[in-house]
Amino acid sequence: ALMASIKLPERVAGKKVAVIGISTPESFVKSTPTYFQDKDGNYIYTFAEGNNGADLYNKVQETVNAAKKDGATYVVAIAHLGIDESSEPWRSTDLIANTTGIDAVLDGHSHSTIAMELVKNKDGKEIPLSSTGTKLVNIGKLTISDGKFTTELVTDYAVKDDATDTFVKSIQEKNEALVNTVVAKSSVDLTTKRADGTRAIRNRET
């Protein structure tokens, strides 16, 4: 399976906008490896993880080029790459610096909160990078105006869609008893961090 996928261009204000999806090669180790293996333990999927990031950049560039060839005026990347130093060379900032043709990157993975950061691409053009953080604290907003891309984070949104709000509340009410049911108790504290504050998950026994 390809690491990058493409959504056929849709018309927005008379322009064709293509959306491409990018998953981090860290998926191999930051999820369950068996998800990507056959019954014999052989890996059957790729995330274009080789050559110190070059395979990822090339695969994304191929996808961007295909979108442009298909008539896209703009290309927006929906990425799950993050900006953590430990994720180099697969960070969203690395990707932008080594590709062209992407007009904006809406990122995830590292749970970073970024309203808009301008990152230079391979041609030196500044590309907006945005990430909404985690747990629905923010809603990301992308605006395209006269060919210019800007991003921002919305934190105060009092107006709700009545139909959606009613639907969500019906699910919450339906599951209220279930989610408040005690299924087990532990005599020890279950923590996600060591005593010194460093993260224990995926680093040591918890």
Regions found by a protein language model. Name each.
Residues 2-83, 125-206:
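Acidic/His-rich catalytic or pseudo-catalytic neighborhoods
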Residues 27, 86, 113-115:
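Conserved protein kinase catalytic core
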Residues 90-143:
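Conserved beta-sheet core of the metallophosphoesterase superfamily
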Residues 81-82, 86-91:
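Short, solvent-exposed, polar/charged sequence segments at loop or secondary-structure edges
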